[in-house]
């Protein structure tokens, strides 16, 4: 529904939207001799929840799923013309909502002098910090993939960029809003009340067909990397009040957000900051995350590098009127290991500590290639000392270990 209780104008079903965009992207470019590259991976994931579920209906034990993520890329005219088509699919044996298909990218991109043009579906990343990307607002989070908000849905867009000595300027027209997916009734990592996507409310008479706009200026100034961004459109975060039927109903507010990302590089230090100011969720508010990464290179005369990370979070939103967040007053600490060996072995460990109630979130991520075509990945996430008032309280029994075996081609 829209905010004025009128039936929403729904954007076409996701698969149809993606198909039409991909068809347009491929058919809009004449046949030009160039380079075609086909790559990607298939994988099997085993996700184990060691604790019994907190809510009725949730599965327990192991979730087995299969991932298919091919990439089709075409380049011509020395790379000035590019076409990409990257679909993604997951088939889950335990949660029907986690079985899903998406087109991550399907676009035509053309460079003409200092200008770049892109039409289609794409993923755009903004940000510099490790533990949270406040300014990264173009794409919707694929929340059923993982809890770290790193996985993103493809976003239909028109992107025009200009590269000059004084920096880069990008403008985005974003037609068609992507709603955030949520776990189903049998799934883990959900609230007690399941989410009713069919009743989603949009603060726009156009419903999820609202056209959003965004822009970003970025530049290198000495040892500084600077990014300034502006976004106006439907929030990628949803408020989740309980509806008349006892289920949570997503509310997507119309917001305006200004963002700043900074990175300062000096010797072994990386100093990082992301900050936003947003209006549209009740009172305007600001939020920031900032910290550092210090790297010890070639530890003990080996090829390995070790990085130490620390970041402080603050978020001034009023959660009575804004989407909930667990990063209101938190400290992140972590360490990164890169062996720099032929198998590209690396690991990241970290914790996020709530400085107000003591809730601790721990994680470990590691990966290593096996030969030329295989890779094994491990991920573990644990909640410790969870306060019942914390936003993460519904997930207190959802600590998990995920193992992936992937074959690349």
Task: Kindly give the residue locations of the regions a language model identified.
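Residue-level signature of outer-membrane beta-barrel architecture
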Residues: 36, 72-76, 109-112, 121, ...
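Repeated loop/turn-to-beta-strand initiation elements of outer-membrane beta-barrel proteins
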Residues: 36, 78-83, 115-117, 166-169, ...
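Membrane-embedded beta-strand positions of outer-membrane beta-barrel proteins
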Residues: 40-42, 83-85, 119, 160, ...
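Transmembrane beta-strand segments that form the barrel wall of outer-membrane beta-barrel proteins
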Residues: 44-52, 82-93, 104, 141, ...
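Residues that define the transmembrane beta-barrel architecture of outer-membrane proteins
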Residues: 58-66, 99-104, 152-156, 163, ...
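Outer membrane beta-barrel
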Residues: 72-189, 222, 385
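Detector for outer-membrane/organellar transmembrane beta-barrel domains
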Residues: 268-354
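Outer-membrane beta-barrel "beta-signal"
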Residues: 292, 395-409
């Amino acid at each position: 529904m829209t905010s004025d209780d009128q039936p929403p104008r729904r954007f076409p079903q996701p698969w149809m939207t993606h198909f039409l965009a991909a068809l347009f992207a491929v058919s809009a470019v004449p046949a030009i001799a160039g380079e075609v590259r086909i790559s990607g991976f298939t994988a099997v994931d085993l996700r184990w929840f060691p604790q019994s579920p907190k809510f009725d209906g949730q599965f327990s034990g192991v979730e087995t799923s299969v991932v298919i993520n091919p990439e089709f890329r075409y380049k011509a005219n020395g790379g000035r013309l590019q076409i990409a088509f990257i679909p993604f699919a997951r088939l889950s044996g335990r949660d029907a909502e986690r079985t899903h298909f998406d087109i991550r990218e399907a676009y035509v991109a053309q460079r003409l002098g200092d200008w770049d043009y892109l039409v289609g579906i794409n993923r755009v990343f903004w940000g510099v910090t490790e533990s949270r990307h406040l300014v990264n607002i173009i794409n919707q989070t694929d929340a059923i993939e993982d809890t770290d908000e790193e996985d993103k849905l493809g976003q239909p867009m028109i992107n025009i960029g200009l590269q000059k000595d004084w920096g880069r300027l990008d403008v985005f027209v974003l037609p068609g809003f992507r709603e955030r997916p949520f776990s189903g009734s049998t799934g883990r990592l959900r609230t007690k009340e399941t989410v009713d996507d069919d009743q989603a409310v949009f603060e726009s008479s156009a419903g999820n067909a609202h056209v959003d706009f965004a822009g970003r200026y970025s530049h290198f100034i000495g040892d500084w990397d600077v990014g300034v961004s502006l976004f106006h459109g439907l929030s990628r975060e949803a408020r989740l009040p309980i509806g008349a039927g006892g289920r949570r109903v997503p509310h997507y507010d119309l917001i305006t957000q200004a963002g700043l990302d900074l990175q300062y590089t000096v010797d072994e230090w990386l100093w990082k900051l992301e900050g936003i100011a947003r209006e549209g969720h009740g009172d305007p508010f600001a939020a920031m995350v900032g910290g550092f990464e210090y790297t010890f290179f070639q530890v003990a005369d080996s090829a390995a590098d070790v990085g130490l990370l620390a970041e402080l979070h603050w978020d001034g939103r009023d959660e009575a009127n804004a989407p909930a967040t667990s990063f209101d007053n938190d400290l992140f600490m972590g360490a990164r290991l890169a062996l720099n060996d032929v198998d590209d072995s690396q690991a990241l460990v970290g914790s996020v500590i709530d400085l107000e109630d003591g809730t601790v979130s721990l994680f470990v991520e590691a990966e290593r290639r096996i030969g030329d075509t295989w890779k094994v990945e491990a991920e573990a996430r644990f909640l410790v000392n969870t306060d019942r008032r914390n936003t993460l309280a519904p997930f207190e029994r959802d600590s998990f270990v995920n193992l992936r075996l992937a074959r690349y081609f």
